[in-house]
């Protein structure tokens, strides 16, 4: 099926690529795709294209990669050029998903039907850069995807549609991300079809109550503070998979913790102390309870289940992981 609605798409990571693919597969024209500039990544730090750029190029969609859309920012000339490109590209609506650049009011005003954002939370909870991570870290029972009509605020626009998803006890950011991306793709295609049919989309202002912010994840947050309760640390490990992972330091070596669950058997051991190192998991004492670590990675190594890790890097009861500086 082909559609008459023309969609400029702005997004960068896999979450956004899923939405772009759904829009394209549904038959909506995408006369322009915006994504962030290629970034160095991987061990070789070679420039890599975003997931959105890769999809667009594979399907013959025009791509632009401005470093900014703000005339008053660090790249005024590039921003001005990008804004002129937007004005010169015939389109009806812009869809934005995890783009990573601020859209000033000047840009929001260009599309006839404005800009629709696909946000991976149940707004107004978890506005901001890392809603999936923060929902798991906080122990939320559910999250979801919200479509909103963008305004100049940070994820403050009126809500068009939302979908709820339960957070499973073993969900990581990686697994939850994939379900949310699929839901977001489904929602945006449905909304675009309604917009084409009706010429408008009803939207409801976000409530003033329940606002929280999902700050961007920093590498410094990876360190596991064994003084915390075991259930808190287990959520942290799940929330930080795939990035930045949980980090436990032993004798100066940073060991990444990729899977863990609360366990019994702490005894009176000090936080960070290895209580047991068994093939089914390494039990570490926490501030409250104990954590059974079931997947680890030594520096320069691969993720391994506890059995394989211990075969090459033995650990023993009584060893103690370092405690990070408080605060």
From Swiss-Prot:
Catalytic activity as recorded in UniProt: L-methionyl-tRNA(fMet) + (6R)-10-formyltetrahydrofolate = N-formyl-L-methionyl-tRNA(fMet) + (6S)-5,6,7,8-tetrahydrofolate + H(+)
Asked if the record carries the keyword Protein biosynthesis, the reply is: yes
- The residues listed in the UniProt record as binding (6S)-5,6,7,8-tetrahydrofolate, with positions renumbered to this chain, are 121-124
UniProt EC number: 2.1.2.9
| InterPro entries for this protein | Fmt, Formyl_trans_C, Formyl_trans_C_sf, Formyl_transf_N, Formyl_transf_N_sf, Formyl_transferase-like_C_sf, GART_AS, Met-tRNA-FMT_C
Which function does this protein serve? Attaches a formyl group to the free amino group of methionyl-tRNA(fMet). The formyl group appears to play a dual role in the initiator identity of N-formylmethionyl-tRNA by promoting its recognition by IF2 and preventing the misappropriation of this tRNA by the elongation apparatus.
**Name of the protein:** Methionyl-tRNA formyltransferase
């Amino acid at each position: 099926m082909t559609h008459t609605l023309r969609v400029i798409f702005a997004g960068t990571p896999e979450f956004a690529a899923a939405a772009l693919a759904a829009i394209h597969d549904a038959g909506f024209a995408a006369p322009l795709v915006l994504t962030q500039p290629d970034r160095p990544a991987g061990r070789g730090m070679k420039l890599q294209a975003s997931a959105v750029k890769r999809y667009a190029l594979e399907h013959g969609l025009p791509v632009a990669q401005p470093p900014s859309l703000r005339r008053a920012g660090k790249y005024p000339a590039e921003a001005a050029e990008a804004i002129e490109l937007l004005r010169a590209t015939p389109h009806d609506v812009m869809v934005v998903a995890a783009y990573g650049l601020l859209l000033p009011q000047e840009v929001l005003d260009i599309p006839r039907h404005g800009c629709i954002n696909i946000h991976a939370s149940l707004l107004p909870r978890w506005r901001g850069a890392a809603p999936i991570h923060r929902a798991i870290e906080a122990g939320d029972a559910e999250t979801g995807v919200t479509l909103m009509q963008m305004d100049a605020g940070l994820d403050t626009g009126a809500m068009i549609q939302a979908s709820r998803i339960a957070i499973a006890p073993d969900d990581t950011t990686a697994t939850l991300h994939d379900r949310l991306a699929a839901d977001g793709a489904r929602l945006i295609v449905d909304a675009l079809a309604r917009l084409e049919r009706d010429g408008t989309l009803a939207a409801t202002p976000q409530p003033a109550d329940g606002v929280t912010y999902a700050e961007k994840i920093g590498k410094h947050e990876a360190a596991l503070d064994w003084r915390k309760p075991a259930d808190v640390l287990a959520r942290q490990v799940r929330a930080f998979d795939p990035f930045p992972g949980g980090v436990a330091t032993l004798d100066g070596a940073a060991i990444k913790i990729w899977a863990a669950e609360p366990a019994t058997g702490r005894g009176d051991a000090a936080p960070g102390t290895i209580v047991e190192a068994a093939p089914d998991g390494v039990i570490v004492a926490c501030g409250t309870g104990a954590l059974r670590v079931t997947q680890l990675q030594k520096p320069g190594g691969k993720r391994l289940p506890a059995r394989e890790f211990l075969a090459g890097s033995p650990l023993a009861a009584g060893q103690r992981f370092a405690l990070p500086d408080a605060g």
